Amino acid sequence: MTQNMFCFQCEQTAGGKGCTGCAGVCGKKADTAQLQDNLTGALITLASYALHQQKQNTVIDKLILDGLFTTLTNVNFHDETIQKLRQRVHAETLAIGGSIQDYDMQRIWNADEDIRSLKSLILFGIRGVAAYAYHAELLGYRSEKTAAFLYKALSALQEDWGLEQLLPIVMEVGEINLICMELLDQANTETFGTPAPTEVSLTVEKGPFIVITGHDLYDLKQLLEQTDGKGIHVYTHGEMLPAHAYPELNQYTHLKGNIGTAWQNQQKEFAQLPAPVVYTTNCLMPPAGSYQDRIFTTGVVSFPGVQHIASDDDTHQKDFSAVIAKALELGGYAEDQQFTGMNGGSKVTTGFAHQAVLSVADVVIDAVKAGAIRHFFLVAGCDGVNSKRSYYRDFVQATPADTVVLTLACGKYRFNDLDLGTIGNLPRLMDIGQCNDAYSAIKIAVALAEAFDCSVNELPLSMILSWYEQKAVSILLTLLHLGIKNIKLGPTLPAFVSANVLNLLVENYNIAPITTVEQDLKAILG
């Protein structure tokens, strides 16, 4: 059968094997998928030549971040912008004395399945790494070790290497991603303040408003500054929800609350919304015609026919005046609108980052020692359309009253409006933050392990993870790099992980797919 495209990087890939038709399940057309492969091949050629000729520079560093982030799922559907980025990669290749011979990605897709699996883990993992490094650099925080590794990892993709040479690089992706998440945590807290537990309303007040989605807190900061005093309210959506916990953002009284749920519901939630929506990162779904004129993209996000907010290359400043004008034109709702979470709740709470949790570490430790807390669950990761994802809500609802649930990333929308009660003064459900705040979860786990003089694997802690795109891959590799075992992963296992590579992960880390709530809870708690 003739393939129009090949892409299997996300959890929703067709048939659990790969998208090969005229378009991917994500909405990416075959031509766009090919252009993204061409861009990736150009990056591999540039990085390999620069590495071997020792001609790395900050211009190439930035191109690598932009190029890798552009090819992340649900980021860029715009052929023209992808082609322009590839042209910039070609220009830089020529500038350092290389030749334009893009690496043929079919050599990876058609390779031995175990080699393909390891190279896919490297490629998809560094796409996640690049996203986190991109956000940190916008705030002026840079890791030379990360920049150097991305050359090495891209170069490795064009080598005819075996398992023994590729597997260490797979694990190194996890190591570098930990550095990136730590750096981004530092960047966010030093720029926007230390997150604190914050209650967030799901009510949208009457009058003009703007919705901002994605992960870029700096974009939100600029939008809040430019809308201050204009009678326009701002609401977060999706992965922007944890922004409410940062003091430098929460101080703006017109940052009112959160609207909507996880990314996969946006086409329904935005269809009749009388307000513009700003996409700062993934996850963008192809917008319906009914609301496309109200959509704005920025950064590496792009979609044909949608207005794009450019930024100054040096200052990263953006002009949101077109968004503001659209908000005033649309006018918002005539009366307050009470929206709810997926379970009918009218409010959610976020901000339980490592600083907040560890500030009451003695209370947590005493509760464990006294038997008030029997177990911790990290139920975290991405959401999506797979019906099996209802498992995560059902799991959280079934956790006993003497257990604590930590969560992060957009998978939390399945259950973040539930009231699980408290253990003493501690809420049983704690939202740590965005997907990159997996670093906070790691910090909390390590601190608890030190307090109890044991390893993380010996803690009464279980990780029940959901994945969708490539940032989840990089986080999983970080957990494996740290030697964390007994992870349960769902809703399905990645199509790009071969049987042999999966067996390797099972043997070394006892990673396993989710089964049923009852079986998994019994296996964990007995």
Where are these regions (language model features)?
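Anaerobic metallocofactor- and corrinoid-dependent redox/one-carbon enzyme cores
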Residues: 2-37, 44-45, 171-526
